[in-house]
Amino acid sequence: MPAGVGNASGSVLDMTSVRTVPSAVALVTFAGAALSGVIPAIARADPVGHQVTYTVTTTSDLMANIRYMSADPPSMAAFNADSSKYMITLHTPIAGGQPLVYTATLANPSQWAIVTASGGLRVNPEFHCEIVVDGQVVVSQDGGSGVQCSTRPW
């Protein structure tokens, strides 16, 4: 055997290398198996918030005043101090039988989801509102010249 090849016993294989290679293969295999369980869990993680859909309809054509929560306030005090940061206010036309739909992403819709609609006519426009959270109807209300849907008492 040429000088510098092999180990002290003259063997080409060094037992230290033989033991190290299977350990490295086992480590890589174990790490791959562990990550394959983690990556799908990360991909399935819940989104940051809940998809909230507000729908308003009426039986008459009119200019409606609509307000809905578009973002979670950090507290009721923050909301009371400046509700315009969290609630959208619109003065918009609405056609009888044609729904107006607005969406928001809220972290805590059971605390903050609300939509109101009102309008003035000599005949009540018969408003209807609905709140859907993550595809499930959670509130539905009917009203005459105005209506409010919320997930908690205001």
Curated annotation (Swiss-Prot):
The keyword Ribosomal protein does not apply. It is a single-pass membrane protein. The keyword Transmembrane helix applies. It comes from the Bacteria. GO terms for cellular component: extracellular region; membrane; peptidoglycan-based cell wall. It is found in: Membrane. The chain crosses the membrane at residues 23-43. Keywords: Membrane, Transmembrane, Transmembrane helix. This is Uncharacterized protein Rv2576c. It comes from Mycobacterium tuberculosis (strain ATCC 25618 / H37Rv).
